[in-house]
Amino acid sequence: WIMGHMVNAIEQVGEFLNLGADAIEFDFDFDKDGIAQVTHHGIPCDCGRKCTKKAIFTEYLDNIRQVTTPDDPKFREQLVLLALDLKLQRISSAKAYRAGEDVAKKLLDHYWQRGNSRARAYILLNIPLVEDYEFIRAFKDTLKNEGYESYNDKVGINFSGNEDLDKIRDVLEILGIHKQVWQADGITSCFARGTERLKEALEKRDTPGYNYINKVYAWTLVRKSIMRRSLRLGVDGVMSNNPDRVIKALKEKEFADKFRLATYNDNPWEKFRG
């Protein structure tokens, strides 16, 4: 999976898909009451990127629904995964539950259209910190209470704040989540990062019987040397400002027989058995 990073304006969706991404990540801000308002990262952000691009959250969802709906004029077959970067660290943890309710209802109304939409993308909820785990509980409670619990099959969880992996496992245990879990590791493209935690995540992913990491991705990679390093370690995904560079790396002799771009037929919640 090649995740286009910080795709927060509607016009950027096509731009990143044209560069080769099969997944996009977008940020969204909440108001003080935990209501999702806009797709927006803000300052600071990655080097060389404009930090202030934005869209109204519901309008963004309406557009991305069309882009991921077969037979729609806007349909792009390659887009199979949406990573929602939840800026929960900007609001009180006490509002995390309310935020989870709101996001679930907005997805029901604007993406899934309560069963009337054929939009097919998988959705990855990126939670910045484990202290905001009530967002996940609220999200799942809302799907159940609204009568659409089946959509849980399309939704995965990722804690993206580089926290202790055992601490993350403990929170997933509290929530009763033992599947559909990604683990991110990374840092803004402005800085270098070692591989110790990334290797630990990959080791846990590959441990038989360990159910708290199904996939691992590295972010935000812009240098080909770092992309190659991550591929050699065996990541499932790469988040990048430059998807075209990842595409070129995948075509190199070292990787061409080991990796390919994920499609809709690849389940993002299953561990890869090579």
From Swiss-Prot:
Catalyzed reaction equations: an N-(acyl)-sphingosylphosphocholine = an N-(acyl)-sphingosyl-1,3-cyclic phosphate + choline; an N-(acyl)-sphingosylphosphoethanolamine = an N-(acyl)-sphingosyl-1,3-cyclic phosphate + ethanolamine; a 1-acyl-sn-glycero-3-phosphocholine = a 1-acyl-sn-glycero-2,3-cyclic phosphate + choline; a 1-acyl-sn-glycero-3-phosphoethanolamine = a 1-acyl-sn-glycero-2,3-cyclic phosphate + ethanolamine
Keywords for the protein's UniProt record, in alphabetical order: Cytolysis, Dermonecrotic toxin, Disulfide bond, Hemolysis, Lipid degradation, Lipid metabolism, Lyase, Magnesium, Metal-binding, Secreted, Toxin
Cofactor annotation remark: Binds 1 Mg(2+) ion per subunit.
Tissue: Expressed by the venom gland.
Cellular component GO terms, alphabetical: extracellular region
Cofactor: Mg(2+)
GO terms, biological process: killing of cells of another organism; lipid catabolic process
Gene3D superfamilies in the record: Phosphatidylinositol (PI) phosphodiesterase
Subcellular location, record wording: Secreted
Residues the record marks as active site: 5, 41
Superkingdom in the source lineage: Eukaryota
Cystine crosslinks: 45-51, 47-190
Chain residues that bind Mg(2+): 25, 27, 85
Molecular-function GO terms, alphabetical: lyase activity; metal ion binding; phosphoric diester hydrolase activity; toxin activity
EC number(s) stated in the UniProt entry for this protein: 4.6.1.-
Family, as annotated: Belongs to the arthropod phospholipase D family. Class II subfamily.
Purpose: Dermonecrotic toxins cleave the phosphodiester linkage between the phosphate and headgroup of certain phospholipids (sphingolipid and lysolipid substrates), forming an alcohol (often choline) and a cyclic phosphate. This toxin acts on sphingomyelin (SM). It may also act on ceramide phosphoethanolamine (CPE), lysophosphatidylcholine (LPC) and lysophosphatidylethanolamine (LPE), but not on lysophosphatidylserine (LPS), and lysophosphatidylglycerol (LPG). It acts by transphosphatidylation, releasing exclusively cyclic phosphate products as second products.
Protein name as annotated: Dermonecrotic toxin SdSicTox-betaIIB1bv
Organism placement in taxonomy: Eukaryota, Metazoa, Ecdysozoa, Arthropoda, Chelicerata
